[in-house]
C-alpha cells in the first residue's frame, strides 16, 4: 500500500462521511449531521462555480486543491476534529503536510463560519499555490503588500498597537503572517461582496472596511479582486 492509499485508509477510519465537489472532498465524522454537510457542499460549490454553469470558474485553482488533497473536515466541535487531525491521524502515520491541508469546520457554527472556513481552504490551499507571486502567503507578494497597507505597515508579528489609519487590526498572537494574509483575503472579498455590511459593530475591532464602498479605498486589493484573470467570485454564496 503506497503512502497516499495508506493515508486515505487512515482518514476514512475516522471521517466516515464524504461528499465531493469537483473532486474536492468534504469529510465528516460519524455524528456530523448530513444537512450540515450538504450546507458546506452548497457553499463550496458556489464559491468555486460562482456563475452556476456547473463548471469551475477557475480550473487551475480547483486542480490545485484536488492534486494536493485539500479537504474540509467536519464534526460537531472543533475540539473533536482537531483531536483527530493533530493526534490520531498523525499517530496513524498520516503526514503533517497532509493534515495541514485538511481544514476544519464545526457543524454547529453559524452560517458566516461556513463561508469563512471554506473560503480559507480555497484561498490558502488553492489561490496561494497557483499564483504564488500574487496570492502567496508570505512577505512581498501582491496580496501581502496590500495587507501591509491595510495594517498600516509590515508587521511580522502582531504589534502592541496598530497605526490609527489601519483598517485591518487583527490582534490574535497565534495568527502568524501567513495566517494574517488568509484572514485578510476573507475579510476583503466578503466585504466587497456585501457579506459584512451589517456586521460593523461585531467586527470593527478587527476589520473596518466592511462594505463594498469602503473596500474601494483599498486600491491594491480591489484591483486583485477585480482582475478577471483570477476568476474570483463576484456573488456572495447563499444558504439553500
Q: What positions do the PLM features span?
A:
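Low-complexity, polar-biased intrinsically disordered regions enriched in Pro/Ser/Thr/Gly
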Residues: 83-90, 171, 196-205
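Short, glycine-/small- and polar/acidic-enriched structural segments
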Residues: 7
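Acidic/His-rich structured neighborhood in mature extracellular/periplasmic domains
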Residues: 2, 10-14, 21-160
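General secondary-structure edge motif
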Residues: 24, 98, 165-169, 205
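Pan-zinc metallopeptidase signature
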Residues: 178, 182-240
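Conserved aromatic-histidine-acidic binding/catalytic patches
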Residues: 28-32, 106-110, 170-182, 205-213
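Post-HExxH zinc-binding segment in Zn-dependent metallohydrolases
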Residues: 126-200
Amino acid at each position: 500500500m503506497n503512502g497516499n492509499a495508506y493515508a486515505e485508509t487512515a482518514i476514512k477510519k475516522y471521517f466516515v462521511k464524504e461528499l465531493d465537489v469537483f473532486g474536492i472532498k468534504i469529510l465528516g465524522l460519524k455524528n456530523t449531521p448530513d444537512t450540515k454537510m450538504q450546507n458546506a457542499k452548497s457553499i463550496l460549490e458556489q464559491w468555486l462555480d460562482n456563475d452556476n454553469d456547473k463548471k469551475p470558474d477557475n480550473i487551475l485553482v480547483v486542480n490545485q486543491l484536488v492534486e494536493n488533497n485539500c479537504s474540509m473536515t467536519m464534526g460537531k466541535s472543533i475540539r473533536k476534529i482537531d483531536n483527530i487531525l493533530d493526534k490520531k491521524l498523525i499517530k496513524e502515520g498520516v503526514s503533517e503536510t497532509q493534515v495541514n491541508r485538511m481544514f476544519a469546520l464545526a457543524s454547529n457554527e453559524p452560517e458566516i463560519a461556513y463561508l469563512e472556513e471554506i473560503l480559507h481552504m480555497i484561498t490558502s490551499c488553492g489561490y496561494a499555490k497557483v499564483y504564488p507571486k500574487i496570492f502567496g502567503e508570505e512577505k512581498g507578494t501582491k496580496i501581502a503588500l496590500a495587507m501591509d497597507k491595510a495594517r498600516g505597515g509590515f508587521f511580522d508579528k502582531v504589534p502592541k498597537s496598530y497605526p490609527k489609519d489601519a483598517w485591518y487590526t487583527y490582534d490574535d498572537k497565534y495568527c502568524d503572517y501567513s495566517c494574517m494574509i488568509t484572514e485578510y483575503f476573507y475579510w476583503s472579498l466578503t466585504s466587497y461582496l456585501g457579506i459584512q455590511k451589517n456586521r460593523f459593530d461585531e467586527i470593527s475591532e478587527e476589520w473596518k472596511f466592511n462594505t463594498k464602498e469602503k473596500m474601494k479605498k483599498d486600491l491594491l486589493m480591489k484591483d486583485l479582486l477585480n482582475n478577471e484573470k483570477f476568476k474570483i467570485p463576484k456573488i456572495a454564496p447563499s444558504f439553500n
